[in-house]
Amino acid sequence: SEMCIRDSIKDWPEMVPLTDNLLLKVASVIHDPVTTTDELIPSGETSSYRSNPLGLAEFTLSRKDPEYVGRAKAIQAVEKVREAGECMGKAFPEVKEVMHAIKEKFEDVCGSNTGVGSTIYAVKPGDGSAREQAASCQKVLGGWANIAKEYATKRYRSNLINWGMLPFVIDKDFDFDNDDYVFIPGIKDAVKNKTEVIKAYVVNKDFAEIELRLGELTDDERQIITDGCLINYYKYN
């Protein structure tokens, strides 16, 4: 007999594998000493959405940074155009300028090899309960990474990895702003080859070079990130 699924239960959206390069737009900057999972995705009023990934994601950072969801969705719209094989620049003039600036320095960069998404910068995210939605909600809004000084818990970092997000650590202080564009060339190779220091560039700040690290990752975790998420990892392997 056919399985009956209630309207309140929604599928996970498709998640694409990691691309050769990444262009990340900063969608939230949090300078608090610690950011909790409850701040990343509140409990309580969100519980009725727990079987609706996109519905739940609307509450991401709602108490901490109410503008986050809109910013993340705006850059996710660019990625959807890219995934459809259409011209990002035509649809989004700002991205056209950014990609043009990148191509002047990295000429083999193009839409087919460069994924576009959001990242948050937080000093020490992930304290508190082990709720997986703190990571998955960012992912379904097009999040491709976190950048942090450190991660508050191993569990939050593991959740990022399982949702195919890069748990970057930055040692030196950098003054990130919302809407900064961070370009990471060769990120897929860096993950596969266990590159310790990954060079990235803040495009709109004169290509300021920053150094990112991924820290310890098992071979399986590297494959999960490359495949796009744990769901894909089981599908592909």
Residue ranges and their predicted role:
Residues 1-237:
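Fe-S-dependent hydro-lyases/dehydratases of central metabolism
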